[in-house]
């Protein structure tokens, strides 16, 4: 069994939980996912099955789109709604929407983030959330991410000295939207947190077409595996190149092939089928991952 699944992960489960349950449903162990979602986050979780697991690194490279809600007026230990309240800065006056929009626009492009303590980023061999649960604070390494767009998508609502509004963000892999929400609040002079989040697009797949675990199980029960999408969907942003019969044989035998390209990596195709991921070595390309 080989292919890619557009899974709608529900709230309350980790990405690992989703993979574990899919292994039982599909009765196969070779399953991985293309980008972790926090337990409270709903949305697209790209799933790789069989040979497609070798494409996970390329699936993760593609940009992602999220829709969610930011709350100004209080911050939490986890930067989202699941944490304990850390600080309060009451919102006592109406806010200027133009100022919020301007602040959001100023956070686009290449930016640097410090990952939250409650995250799976490793420092000295341990995940940050392990330090956080033990009450330990450690220095967290900055990372560079790209925010392609960051827009407010609703009017501002006010309740209990807090302000809320919805947003849409398109960003690179490795972006912590929780941290983006907190940093926006800081720009506006408020403690803040991300109060809701949904991933609507990832690895070329949309939430509109995603299936839940229950829906997948129902289809498997009647031997309907049409939800398995082809490996070709998993090449991410790699440039495609069509191979000749002779080049396919060279790839099959692990030989270098000559191609007119300067790309570090290419996706080699033959008759619309993915044959190999090719890696540039000086003046030729070496088969790095072969799918024949």
Swiss-Prot record:
GO terms for biological process: mRNA pseudouridine synthesis; tRNA pseudouridine synthesis. It catalyses: uridine(55) in tRNA = pseudouridine(55) in tRNA. The keyword Isomerase applies. One of its GO terms (molecular function) is tRNA pseudouridine(55) synthase activity. Keywords: Isomerase, tRNA processing. InterPro entries: PsdUridine_synth_cat_dom_sf (IPR020103), PsdUridine_synth_N (IPR002501), tRNA_psdUridine_synth_TruB (IPR014780), TruB_C (IPR032819). Its EC number is 5.4.99.25. The active site is at residue 38. Pfam families: TruB_C_2, TruB_N. Belongs to the pseudouridine synthase TruB family. Type 1 subfamily. Responsible for synthesis of pseudouridine from uracil-55 in the psi GC loop of transfer RNAs. This is tRNA pseudouridine synthase B.
């Amino acid at each position: 069994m080989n292919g890619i699944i557009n899974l709608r992960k529900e709230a309350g489960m980790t990405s690992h939980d989703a993979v574990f349950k899919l292994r039982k449903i599909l009765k196969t162990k070779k399953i991985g996912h293309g980008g972790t979602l926090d337990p409270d986050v709903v949305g697209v979780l790209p799933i790789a099955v069989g040979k497609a697991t070798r494409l996970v690194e390329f699936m993760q490279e593609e940009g992602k789109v999220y829709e969610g809600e930011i709350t100004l007026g209080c911050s939490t230990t986890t930067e989202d709604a699941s944490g304990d309240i850390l600080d309060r800065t009451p919102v006592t006056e109406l806010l200027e929407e133009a100022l919020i929009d301007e602040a959001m626009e100023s956070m686009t492009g290449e930016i640097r983030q410090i990952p939250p303590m409650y995250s799976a980023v490793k420092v000295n061999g341990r995940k940050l959330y392990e330090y956080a649960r033990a009450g330990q604070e450690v220095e967290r390494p900055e990372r560079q991410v790209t925010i392609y767009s960051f827009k407010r998508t609703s009017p501002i609502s006010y309740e209990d000295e807090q302000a809320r509004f919805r947003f849409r963000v398109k960003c690179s892999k490795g972006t912590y939207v929780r941290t983006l929400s907190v940093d926006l609040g800081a720009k506006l002079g408020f403690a803040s947190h991300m109060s809701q989040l949904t991933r609507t697009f990832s690895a070329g797949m949309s939430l509109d077409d995603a299936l839940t675990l229950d829906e997948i199980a129902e289809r498997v029960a009647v031997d309907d595996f049409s939800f398995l999408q082809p490996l070709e969907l998993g090449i991410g942003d790699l440039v495609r190149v069509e191979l000749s019969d002779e080049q396919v044989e060279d790839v099959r035998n692990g030989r270098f092939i000559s191609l007119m390209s300067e790309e570090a990596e290419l996706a080699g195709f033959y008759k619309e089928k993915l044959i190999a991921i090719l890696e540039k070595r000086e003046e030729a390309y070496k088969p790095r991952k072969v799918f024949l």
